[in-house]
Amino acid sequence: MKRMILFISCLLLIDIVVGGREGYPADSKGCKITCFLTAAGYCNTECTLKKGSSGYCAWPACYCYGLPDSVKIWTSETNKCGKK
């Protein structure tokens, strides 16, 4: 039983370490990448170009999974979109 708990704990830890971050990637202006009126698969392409594992359109902005630490992720606390 202890081995099973240890095994499951290791799997969860691997998922956290390898899984990467998720969120709305920010563009050069600090804004979310919009997917309003874009083709199907646009966000998945944008996310994989940023070395993420996948992504989808969480209308109206792209949401990515598995992003590396080097990619800026938009947050409401650090929102600089449209501000000078």
UniProtKB/Swiss-Prot annotation:
For this UniProt record, the keywords arranged alphabetically read as follows: Allergen, Amidation, Disulfide bond, Secreted, Signal
In terms of SMART domains, this protein maps to: Knot1
Q: List the molecular function annotations (GO) for this entry.
A: sodium channel inhibitor activity; toxin activity
Which PROSITE patterns does the record match to this protein?
LCN_CSAB
Keyword NAD, does the record have it?
A: no
Q: Give a GO biological-process term.
A: defense response
Record family assignment = Belongs to the long (4 C-C) scorpion toxin superfamily. Sodium channel inhibitor family. Alpha subfamily.
User: What is the name of this protein?
Assistant: Toxin Ts4
